[in-house]
UniProtKB/Swiss-Prot annotation:
The gene is PB1. Residues 249-256 are annotated as: Promoter-binding site. One of its GO terms (molecular function) is nucleotide binding. It comes from the Viruses. It comes from Influenza A virus (strain A/Brazil/11/1978 H1N1). Pfam families: Flu_PB1 (PF00602). Residues 53-82 are annotated as: Disordered. A motif (Nuclear localization signal) lies at residues 187-195, 203-216. Phosphorylated by host PRKCA. This is RNA-directed RNA polymerase catalytic subunit. Its EC number is 2.7.7.48. It is found in: Host nucleus; Host cytoplasm.
Length: 757
């Protein structure tokens, strides 16, 4: 029988058909090779947008810097970064006038955070530029290396463990005439292998001390390393993103804390909330505009797109904003917040790995590191690369490019949102003083603008005024990529609005399926994704039930754990059949042990082990969850786990799922090849941190986890905790006098050793 597909949609409102338009199946594109070209593009473009600014030279590093602030106003529609200070300050003043006390209150909240935040805040985050080794490292390692170098240079404020004290060390380090660092290096030598009698290359890892003079240190402290952004869909070209070093991160964190606090109080801000909360917030703004426009006015909405948002933003503008926002606050607070924008106006972009050349005829490959680009003969490069290098050469210092204007991706999302909202705020009638008015939504560089006016001419005038106001603040609305519709249909941050936000379920498709972490986590994540989509994305019960069956099927094929009574032969089927036959209560077997699936859409919130616990044979329970069983990994499981979900569009989302530590929650072993590289020292450091943190967790278990308040080191905190616990246990008779005395003696010994050190 032929089915006419249009019949499927007869009963469906048009907006619900959005999920059928989804183009993103399959894997997103990843980048290969070096990001040097993309970074040079970013640097060159940023300077081009500000080319009519003033050139100056940084007195400390000698880096040439371009300052477009208060530069000539553009005469055409080309993107430009000439923000006008007085306009930005006025926009801030009007924002405060419409929201009395907003800046004052946010400053008070932030001041509290600044005084309480501990330095371990900086261990969050993935890759970080490690200035001591001049390459990227996991955040925790980069922080540890920085602190280690600070201490060996006599900078000790960080020992208090407060972030603000660590930042005092950062400030002081910039005044030092020289800084001594420890770097890793590799020695290669050819030796004869005793067994095979062949020559082999032996690598040994050494650590060596190196002195950096003030200029070299400042360049490193102000450096942002660059990488290529991966997994971006819908783009032909890749682009560069930046990872700042530890000196900058802490200051940025405090600025963003202040900006976040302001955004929370602004109804037009799409940050920092997300998901349903964000949809509700946005729907309110739309409702306000539609109810006011019913009789006399018409209402239109622009789905907006800005050209090169962060390349036209300017740290100097952010400095002006912060100076205004904190104007009645204590000096120390104003200083600490102004450092991030100052560092960004003096930033250097590291060009990455450089270029790879290969000669087909001689079968030779060689890497030209970024440091050599300043004086290498350009005849080896093709035309487009040659142009890039020629353009960037005046800006190069030691393989990094001076990049004063522009912000680099993702650095000040919250603060730039405040800037955007300040323009939306100017759309009130009391400011436009005419018949048109506007409002809208802003989330980082994405915006939606709603304009109301008595007639079409008024709408046009309103849009023009908005466009020109943006130009004054260094924001460039793209006329080519923005489009206008009757209010009621628009898109904002990948949410599609049509008389209400439409659930675009297909966006979530990539996160369905088996993640490949381990059998325990994958089962939990799989059912949690289905549960979340029933809550948030209009996934109906019938479809959810089908998704669940498909997931179980996928899971069984991935881990070769078909039911014990199946005919399918796999590598595991022999073991699974044996287990099936000797199990009395077969319903109690986990799916990953060949058991049946007991999940349905009503019990998705229960971890599988809990769901089947009552049904399990006793000896099976004893093997599955016995903490003494060496195969039960308790290492990662902390009652709640986090998985990173990649939706098809938009940022990766953190998703919490429950999992129970069982023999199935294994952690795969690290690749052994790392042990022979210069990373080995780093690996050992990491393991040491892991051990220290695990020990600390033992003293302060999550259930009673009150952060040790006050200024004490980890060791002091653990010793004092041990003493308190020992006294309580002794007085309640849980431990004997001898044990109590021994604990007290050990504590004193530890303190004595610390004093001697």
């Amino acid at each position: 029988m032929d089915v006419n597909p249009t019949l499927l949609f007869l009963k469906v409102p048009a907006q619900n058909a959005i999920s059928t338009t989804f183009p993103y199946t399959g894997d997103p594109p990843y980048s290969h090779g070096t990001g040097t070209g993309y970074t040079m593009d970013t640097v060159n473009r940023t300077h081009q947008y500000s080319e009519r600014g003033r050139w100056t030279k940084n007195t400390e590093t000698g880096a040439p810097q371009l300052n477009p602030i208060d530069g000539p106003l553009p005469k055409d529609n080309e993107p430009s970064g000439y923000a006008q200070t007085d306009c930005v300050l006025e926009a801030m003043a009007f924002l405060e006038e419409s929201h009395p006390g907003i800046f004052e209150n946010s400053c008070i909240e932030t001041m509290e955070v600044v005084q309480q935040t501990r330095v371990d805040k900086l261990t969050q985050g993935r890759q970080t530029y490690d200035w001591t080794l001049n390459r990227n490292q996991p955040a925790a390692t980069a922080l540890a290396n920085t602190i280690e170098v600070f201490r060996s240079n006599g900078l000790m404020a960080n020992e208090s463990g407060r972030l603000i004290d660590f930042l005092k060390d950062v400030m002081e380090s910039m005044d030092r005439e020289e800084v001594e660092i420890t770097t890793h290096f590799q020695r290669k030598r050819r030796v004869r292998d005793n067994v095979t009698k062949k020559m082999v290359t032996q690598r040994t890892i050494g650590k060596k001390k190196q002195r950096l003079n003030k200029r070299s240190y400042l360049i490193r402290a102000l450096t942002l390393n660059t990488m290529t952004k991966d997994a971006e869909r819908g783009k032909l070209k890749r682009r560069a993103i930046a990872t700042p070093g530890m000196q900058i991160r802490g200051f940025v964190y405090f600025v963003e804390t202040l900006a976040r606090s302001i955004c929370e109080k602004l109804e037009q801000s799409g940050l920092p909330v997300g998901g349903n909360e964000k949809k509700a917030k946005l729907a309110n703004v739309v409702r306000k505009m539609m109810t006011n426009s019913q009789d006399t006015e018409i209402s239109f909405t622009i789905t907006g797109d800005n050209t090169k948002w962060n390349e036209n933003q300017n740290p100097r503008m952010f400095l002006a904003m912060i100076t205004y926002i904190t104007r009645n606050q204590p000096e120390w607070f104003r200083n600490i917040l102004s450092i991030a924008p100052i560092m960004f106006s003096n930033k250097m972009a590291r060009l990455g790995k450089g270029y790879m050349f290969e000669s087909k005829s001689m079968k030779l490959r060689t890497q030209i590191p970024a440091e050599m680009l300043a004086n290498i003969d350009l005849k080896y490069f093709n035309d487009s690369t040659r142009k890039k290098i020629e353009k960037i050469r005046p800006l190069l210092i030691d393989g990094t490019a001076s990049l004063s204007p522009g912000m680099m991706m993702g650095m000040f999302n919250m603060l730039s949102t405040v800037l955007g909202v300040s323009i939306l705020n100017l759309g009130q009638k009391r400011y436009t003083k005419t018949t048109y008015w506007w409002d809208g939504l802003q989330s980082s560089d994405d915006f939606a603008l709603i304009v109301n006016a008595p007639n079409y001419a008024g709408i046009q005038a309103g849009v023009d005024r908005f466009y020109r106001t943006c130009k004054l603040l260094g924001i460039n609305m793209s006329k080519k990529k923005s489009y206008i519709n009757r209010t009621g249909t628009f898109e904002f941050t990948s949410f599609f609005y049509r008389y209400g936000f439409v659930a675009n379920f297909s966006m979530e498709l990539p996160s369905f399926g088996v993640s490949g972490i381990n059998e325990s986590a994958d089962m939990s994540i799989g059912v949690t994704v289905i549960k979340n989509n029933m809550i948030n994305n209009d996934l109906g019960p019938a479809t959810a039930q089908m998704a669940l069956q498909l997931f179980i099927k996928d899971y069984r094929y991935t881990y070769r754990c078909h039911r014990g009574d199946t005919q399918i032969q796999t590598r595991r089927s022999f073991e699974i059949k044996k287990l099936w036959e000797q199990t009395r209560s077969k319903a109690g077997l986990l799916v990953s042990d060949g058991g049946p699936n007991l999940y349905n859409i009503r019990n998705l919130h229960i971890p599988e082990v809990c769901l089947k616990w009552e049904l399990m044979d006793e000896d099976y329970q004893g093997r599955l969850c016995n903490p003494l069983n060496p195969f039960v990994s308790h290492k990662e499981i902390e009652s709640v786990n986090n998985a990173v979900m990649m939706p098809a569009h938009g940022p990766a989302k953190n998703m919490e799922y429950d999992a129970v530590a069982t023999t199935h929650s294994w952690v795969p072993k690290r690749n052994r090849s790392i042990l022979n590289t210069s990373q080995r020292g780093i690996l050992e450091d990491e393991q040491m941190y892991q051990r220290c943190c695990n020990l600390f967790e033992k003293f302060f278990p999550s259930s009673s986890y009150r952060r040790p308040v006050g200024i004490s080191s980890m060791v002091e905190a653990m010793v004092s905790r041990a003493r308190i616990d020992a006294r309580i246990d002794f007085e309640s008779g849980r431990i004997k006098k001898e044990e109590f005395t021994e604990i007290m003696k050990t504590c004193s010994t530890i303190e004595e050793l610390r004093r001697q050190k």
